[in-house]
């Protein structure tokens, strides 16, 4: 069952709907359309989901749309439907507060980019992450190598309507880690007490990819164009086999730290979004954390789930496998919160 805002339902109602005739096809058994996604916390919607015996799987949209209207305490308490995973861990995805993602990374001893508390402290190239002015649940990014460049770029982006002064005041400033990016999409099974690597992917970002494709002879024409790093999709990728062991060790340390700081800790899918630094030796630097189902449906096309299960397994199917296993062993309480 899919919960969606009106105007976005056609994909699920027409194209992905489950039908039997003349041949079986589709995967969506039902759709609940709401005027806005935040209405999912309405009592009547909650009871409708409960009547359908739903197990809710949160994605990024669930967080960001509800956060426009509710705080995390309200989300955790008013959501009556059982969550697959740890509903109390969602708030740690934020970059503020005493128990945010950085606290878990520090507890786990996972290397992450150095942070600067003010533009005046900038040393070398930094990435600035701030709320987008027009799409508040998305982030706007820009690069700067000095406090002067920070001020100039920020002023231009405010004038262009990309940032606001208030949003910039709470921006995260961190060193820019050089290297290719890779999202390590893990799945922790409390039933098996094992960590799995579901797959790996990397982001496609506008208009960064356009800049990469421009020949050097034409770069002068782009001097007045601001580079954007807003997400547009994902591409399946792989990492060197020699880096799999460090990746698993990083994931295992994260699971242990999350269990200590946000019990019961990680349940099911989470991702450590990393840069592979040049070294030598090469090292994974975690610049972001995802604490729910990943945004990339293409991770099944990397080889790692097949190494474990003998065939490609999507994240959605792996969640279903865990729920069925928990149901059949009377352990649903270990995977639902």
Segments predicted by a language model, with ranges:
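Phosphate-binding site of ATP-dependent enzymes
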Residues: 147-227, 242-246, 250-266, 271-285
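Active-site ExK catalytic segment of metal-dependent nucleases
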Residues: 101-102, 129, 201, 287-292
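Short internal beta-strands
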Residues: 2-7
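Well-ordered, non-membrane alpha-helical segments in soluble/globular domains
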Residues: 33-44, 67-73, 98-99, 150-157, ...
């Amino acid at each position: 069952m899919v919960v969606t805002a009106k105007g976005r339902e056609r994909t699920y109602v027409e194209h992905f709907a489950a039908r039997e005739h003349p041949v079986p096809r589709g995967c969506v058994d039902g759709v609940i359309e709401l005027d806005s996604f935040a209405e999912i916390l309405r009592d009547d919607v909650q009871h409708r989901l409960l009547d359908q015996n739903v197990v809710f799987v949160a994605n990024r949209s669930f967080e960001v749309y509800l956060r426009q209207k509710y705080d995390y305490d309200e989300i955790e308490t008013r959501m009556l439907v059982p969550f697959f995973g740890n509903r109390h861990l969602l708030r740690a995805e934020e970059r503020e507060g005493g128990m945010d993602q950085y606290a878990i990374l520090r507890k786990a001893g996972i290397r992450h980019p150095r942070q600067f508390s003010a533009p005046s402290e900038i040393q070398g190239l930094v990435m600035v992450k701030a709320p987008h002015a027009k799409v508040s649940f998305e982030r706007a990014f820009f690069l700067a190598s000095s406090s002067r460049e920070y001020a100039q770029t920020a002023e231009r982006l405010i004038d262009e309507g990309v940032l606001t002064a208030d949003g910039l005041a709470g921006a995260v400033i961190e060193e820019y880690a050089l290297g290719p990016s890779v999202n390590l999409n893990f799945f922790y099974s409390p039933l098996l007490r094992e960590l799995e690597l579901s797959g790996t992917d990397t982001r496609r970002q506008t208009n960064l990819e356009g800049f990469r494709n421009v020949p050097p002879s034409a770069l002068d024409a782009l001097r007045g164009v601001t580079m954007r790093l807003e997400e547009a999709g994902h591409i399946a990728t792989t990492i060197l086999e020699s880096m799999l062991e460090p990746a698993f060790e990083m994931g295992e340390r994260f699971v242990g730290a999350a269990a200590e700081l946000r019990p019961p800790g990680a349940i099911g899918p989470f991702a450590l979004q990393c840069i592979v630094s040049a070294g030598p030796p090469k090292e994974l630097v975690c610049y972001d954390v995802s604490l729910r189902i990943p945004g990339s449906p293409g991770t099944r096309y990397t080889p790692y789930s097949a190494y474990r299960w003998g065939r490609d397994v999507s994240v959605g199917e792996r969640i279903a496998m865990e729920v069925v296993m928990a149901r059949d062993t009377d352990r649903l309480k270990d995977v639902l919160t």
